[in-house]
From Swiss-Prot:
This is Ubiquinone/menaquinone biosynthesis C-methyltransferase UbiE. Its EC number is 2.1.1.163, 2.1.1.201. GO terms for molecular function: 2-methoxy-6-polyprenyl-1,4-benzoquinol methyltransferase activity; demethylmenaquinone methyltransferase activity. Pathway: Quinol/quinone metabolism; menaquinone biosynthesis; menaquinol from 1,4-dihydroxy-2-naphthoate: step 2/2; Cofactor biosynthesis; ubiquinone biosynthesis.
Length: 248
């Protein structure tokens, strides 16, 4: 029986996606508020830097693990302000999270040029060579088979298409590392209990972050999936990193 990690627990590979779905379904309505509280607002700055990696908004963009739509809606607003002809597809395996994204898109009057697709990052329902950009923010670590998801990203991107991933990473500096670990394992689950009523969901969150490969390990995984010009940029001392690569 193939096993994988669900946080620090070992589970059957076939069960992980359902467990992850339950986590996000249970916190969907508090997801954005929790992001602000957990990161002390820093996630907004990280995401702003992330979308700067997309210079050409006259593009077909696939946002995978789109969640509540933060990345896609930032791009849609930026494109609208610049009168760009953007095409954005928001994909997530969790329908409850996509419902949150749709609500936000309607509230912000950004529904035009957006498509919503319930799909797994491991099996995307799109033809080869479909998109100019593939974005995924804080989602790849939740995928049961990360290598398979990376190969799918490579498949759906056009030649010279750009893969961009924002993910929690490994802090280098000792004093930041110690504080970050204490904050992650002791404070974040407590905030999750107080605000979302779900301590276990946020225990999974910090455990999944702790187990995610280092910047250099993930860079190798991206390269092995078929990408070229693979690199990364650390933000906030390595709390998160932006990974980027191109198809051939």
């Amino acid at each position: 029986m193939n096993q994988t990690n669900f946080g620090f627990k070992k589970v059957d590979y076939t069960k992980k996606q359902g467990l992850v779905n339950n986590v996000f379904s249970n916190v969907a309505d508090k997801y954005d508020l929790m992001n602000d509280l957990m990161s002390l607002g820093l996630h907004r700055l990280w995401k702003d830097e992330f979308i700067r990696q997309i210079p050409n908004l006259n593009s077909h963009i696939l946002d995978v693990a789109s969640g509540s739509g933060d990345i896609a809606l930032k791009l849609a607003k930026k494109a609208r302000d610049r009168v760009n002809n953007i095409s954005l597809t928001l994909s997530d395996i969790n329908e409850e999270m996509l419902k949150q994204a749709k609500k936000k898109a309607i509230d912000l009057n950004l529904f035009q040029n957006l498509k919503f697709t319930v799909a797994s990052a491991e099996e995307l329902p799109f033809p080869d060579d479909s998109f100019d950009y593939y974005t995924i923010a804080f989602g790849i670590r939740n995928v049961p088979d990360i290598n398979k998801a990376l190969k799918e990203a490579c498949r759906v991107l056009k030649p010279m298409g750009k893969f961009i991933c924002l993910e929690f990473s490994k802090v280098k500096e000792g004093y930041i590392k110690d504080f970050y670990k204490f904050y992650s394992f002791n404070i974040i689950p407590s905030i999750g209990q107080m605000i979302a009523g779900n301590k276990e969901a946020y225990e999974y969150l910090v455990e999944s972050i702790d187990l995610f490969p280092s910047q250099d390990e993930f860079r190798i995984m991206i390269k092995d999936a078929g990408f070229e010009e693979v690199g990364y940029k650390n933000l906030s001392g390595g709390i998160v990193a932006i990974h980027s690569a191109y198809t051939q």
